[in-house]
Amino acid sequence: MKNITVKEMIKSAKENLTELSPQQVEANLTMQDVNIIDLRDTSELIENGIIPGSYHASRGHLEFFADPNCEYYKDFFNKEKNIILYCHSGARSALAAKTLQSMGYDKISHIKGGFKSWMKEVGIIVDYK
């Protein structure tokens, strides 16, 4: 088996992933059929805030929170909803999207450039509680 780099993994993940601009995500903030999920670690949320209305599922818990058959399942991972993922720069969210696709989620997208891009282009945040 060929070894691949994380850069190659991210590139591969993005090939089958819808990338949304921060402005496109901002337009979806109040939509009932959309769940925005922040994959950053808790310390990042405390330090930098979150996009309003987003849910938190750190990347390390993703598979457990997204599996309806797992005791740790979170109902904001709803296959009927459009799920928009984000992390700091878009790398973790691309990898997470690929994982969710393999788990049967087909309404997955992520913020191109992640939270960093969101802050530069939109800048609306709330404190994490």
Where are these regions (language model features)?
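Rhodanese-like catalytic fold shared by cysteine-dependent sulfurtransferases
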Residues: 1-34, 42-82, 91-129
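Active-site flanking residues adjacent to catalytic metal/cofactor-binding acidic residues
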Residues: 37
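Short, surface-exposed ligand- or partner-binding patches at beta-edge/loop junctions that are enriched
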Residues: 86
